[in-house]
Amino acid sequence: AHQLLTASLFRYQAHLFLYLESVGTALAPDGLSPLLDALLCPWPAAVGEALPRRWVAMQPYFYHDIPTTAGDWLRERHSGAQHGRIAVLKPDKWCSYMEYHLKLVSEGLLEGDRWHLISVQENLLFSYLEEPRTHVNIRHQPGVPSAELQEWLAVDPESHFEHFAKEQQGPDAPNFVYLPRCAGTHE
């Protein structure tokens, strides 16, 4: 069984990004909204499958905390407090970016927003964030310095990203675009 904790739908041009958060069995977007599914263009079938897909999963790889129970994870939410953003990796920097971020997660000491999640598909990164931010790390050891963060900062993080046009850029970096939230729970 699963329990849906939150859902948010974000848009960038003709692309939709659906963030689902649950405890228990993972949720799949197919069938959650048949009306929306009917509007989506089909993607080619995955290897080993016969039918085209309406949704393509992104792989989560970077986070600061892991939900264990709904009670542990639930909190007061505010409409408009959920944010989506995208970034595009330069093709020759994909492996480096992934290597450093997987090291940060494995180390578990980098403090960040409890509900921040980054997923990847090809060279596209999608981030989910919430306000107000609640800073934690995976090990739940606040204040312990991250050696992996120092290594990541030493390789010029900004060099890993394509930059968006000035009018698209997020408030904190030229390599992020904040996406409008179209729909979701907690409206």
Model-derived segments and spans:
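A contiguous pocket-lining binding segment that forms or flanks enzyme active sites
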Residues: D113-H116, Y128
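Acidic/histidine-enriched, glycine/proline-rich intrinsically disordered or flexible terminal extensions
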Residues: D65-W73, H163-E187
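An amphipathic, aromatic/His-enriched active-site/gating alpha helix that lines ligand/cofactor pockets
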Residues: H2-L5, S22-V56, E111-D113, P132-F176
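Short beta-strand-to-loop capping motifs
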Residues: Y19-G24, A87-P91, Y128-R133
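Short amphipathic alpha-helical segments
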Residues: A1-L4, K93-R114
